[in-house]
Each structure stands twice: as C-alpha cells, then as structure tokens.
C-alpha cells in the first residue's frame, strides 16, 4: 500500500485503538502512534520525527487524532507531509480549557502563578508553565481537516470548534 492513516490517541488511550479505524480506511495501512508526551512542548520534540519515521515509506499520509492527541498533533505537526486530518472531539483551544478548569476549581490566575502547580479536587493538575506556554505558542494549522464533534464533549465548546 502507498497510503497510511496514523492514529493518535487521547489521554488514557492506547495505540490499539487504531484497529477501530481499519474498516473506515480499507485502502490504507492504519497504524497507531503511541507517544509519551504529556505537554505540548514534549509533543513538539517527539511527534515530528516519529511521524516522519512512521510515514517515510508511504506516498499519502492521513492523520486521525483524538482529544489531547489531536491538540498535540495540531501543535507539532503543522509542517509535516500530511494530506488530510480527521480530528475526533479535538481540544483546539487549550488556553480556554485551562481557564475553564481554573474557574470550575475556584482558582485565580494570580494564585496559579504564585503556586506554579495546583491539583483540582478531581485530580487534574493545573500548571502556570503550561498556561504560559499555550499563550505564547498559538496553533497554526494549514492541513485540510474534518472534525467529528460529540454532543457530549465537555472539553471544547461547540462555539470553539465552529470558530
């Protein structure tokens, strides 16, 4: 085959989820990318070389990415040889998500800046470094993309996806 569809999972997902997409892309080799990155700056180091290596033998590259995996892909793969992307409930505005999480936890920006890291009551870590990074590094994506947005998606609003 000369076509590959690379699947990038979301948080707590795994490379085996790529199997779900094989029937949807019958003319492609479908492979999952199992990454270690936990932050966008780690993804920016890890994703480009890994995707180039995975795709080097193929003429056509399609990306399928989910949730935070989609955000990491949007952040790190804009300059890669990808013909089309399919994003499933992607996080597309990390700053908005962090601010929303801070508001839900009753944490001010000043408090986060002072403490650097705060764990919310539901166990999620809020990080001043992460917030500053996403503000300084906005997404710049120029690859043709289709988005599948779930009506029960609580991470990204419909308005944000539509913008």
Feature locations, PLM:
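Short, surface-exposed "cap/lid" segments of acyl-processing enzymes
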Residues: 1-38
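Structural motif
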Residues: 4, 60-62, 84
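Short hydrophobic segments within beta-strands
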Residues: 6-11, 64, 88, 148
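Alpha/beta-hydrolase active-site loop
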Residues: 17, 38-56
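Glycine-rich phosphate-binding loop signature in dinucleotide/nucleotide-binding domains
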Residues: 54-59, 141
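Gly/Ala-rich beta-loop-alpha elbow adjacent to hydrolase catalytic centers
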Residues: 64-73
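Aromatic pocket-lining residues of Rossmann-like dinucleotide-binding sites
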Residues: 76-80
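The alpha/beta-hydrolase serine catalytic core
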Residues: 82-163
């Amino acid at each position: 085959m000369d076509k590959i569809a690379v699947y990038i999972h979301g948080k707590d997902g795994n490379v085996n989820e790529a199997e779900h997409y094989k029937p949807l892309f019958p003319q492609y080799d479908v492979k999952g990318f199992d990454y270690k990155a936990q932050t966008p700056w780690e993804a920016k180091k890890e994703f480009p070389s890994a995707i180039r290596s995975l795709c080097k033998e193929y003429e056509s590259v399609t990306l399928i990415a989910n949730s935070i995996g989609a955000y990491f892909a949007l952040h790190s793969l804009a300059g890669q040889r990808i013909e089309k992307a399919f994003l499933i409930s992607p996080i597309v505005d990390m700053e908005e998500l962090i601010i929303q999480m801070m508001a839900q936890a009753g944490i001010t920006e000043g408090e986060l800046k002072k403490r650097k890291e705060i764990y919310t009551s539901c166990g999620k870590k809020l990080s001043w470094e992460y917030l500053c990074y996403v503000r300084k590094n906005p997404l710049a994506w120029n690859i043709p993309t289709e988005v599948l947005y779930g009506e029960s998606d609580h991470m990204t609003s419909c308005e944000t996806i539509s913008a």
